[in-house]
Regions:
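Short linear interaction motifs
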Residues: 10-20
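Outer membrane beta-barrel
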Residues: 23-53, 63-179, 192, 197, ...
């Protein structure tokens, strides 16, 4: 049970430790099955976004034909199911294999959210990237989260070191995601290089921390003018924090700066 709780991802919308757990005869391995059903309802008086999530970039201009004066919506597609296998071996120490999905696919179909394994500080699989801070995201009813925050999932191989007291250091090699404005002459190409990330985090109590993160990337595109592939460098810097002023008052915040990281930020 302690491993189940300690390895929970620190995001408000992530499910807690499972209620149903199966263990082997020796008690070295445990498989947890869990999830939740979540329904939200909202009413918009001023015509915001024709989407169950709030994305400021989708707000139509005043006078636009897409602008709705009033709008009522309900959604249950963020309901989540997950499987979590935890255990301990001599070679791997404590390990976790985790997979989760909700119904956010096209037509509310089942969609993968996380699928990864962690052992000896390594994370291998599909999960949240290193250039973001789950613990610095405030609790929100809206599933998309706060505007301007770094938020993305990616296939990765990352390593987190927490052997120093109060400190965590992380590095990662991640599958890139490139998006941008194209035209008849320019198209997004297959990518040649992974994204490289690094982070350092200092914790001064269980609910307070300061994190610095960076990302370096190469973005490849094709031009029909010279029939060649070109690359542009991108980078990002992030400072984030969360700390408790009182036992019931938690402060969250983050600042992001960079070039070519727009697809990793909530808009």
């Amino acid at each position: 049970r302690s491993i189940m709780n300690e390895t929970r991802l620190p995001r408000f919308h992530e499910p807690k430790a499972p209620r149903f757990v199966l263990t082997d005869r020796q008690g070295k391995f445990a498989l947890g099955i869990g999830g939740y059903v979540r329904a939200t309802a909202e009413y918009d008086f001023g015509g915001i976004v024709k989407d169950v999530d709030f994305y400021p970039a989708l707000i139509p201009n005043k006078g636009s034909a897409d602008r709705a004066r009033n709008q009522f919506q309900m959604d249950i597609s963020t309901s989540t199911l997950f499987l979590k296998l935890v255990g301990h071996t001599k070679r791997l120490g404590d390990f976790v294999v985790y997979t989760a999905a909700n119904f956010r696919g096209d037509g509310k179909t089942f969609e993968l959210q996380n699928a990864y394994a962690t052992f000896l500080g390594f994370t291998l699989g599909y999960s949240y990237g290193n250039f973001m801070d789950l613990a610095a995201l405030p609790p929100t009813i809206d599933f998309a989260g706060p505007n301007g925050s770094a938020f993305y999932r990616t296939t990765q191989l990352s390593y987190m070191c927490n052997k120093l007291k109060n400190w965590k250091f992380g590095v990662g090699v991640e599958m890139p995601s490139v998006d941008g404005t194209t035209n008849q002459y320019l198209t997004i190409n297959t990518q040649r290089m992974p994204d490289f990330t690094a982070s350092a985090q200092y914790n001064w109590n269980a609910n307070s921390h300061l994190k610095l993160a960076a990302i370096v990337r190469s973005m490849t595109y094709s031009s029909s003018v010279d029939n060649k592939a070109h690359s542009k460098a991108g980078y990002g810097l992030q400072a984030s924090t969360s700390f408790n002023v009182t036992p019931k008052w938690q402060v969250y915040g983050q600042v992001n700066y960079g070039k070519g990281i727009g697809q990793y930020l909530n808009d």
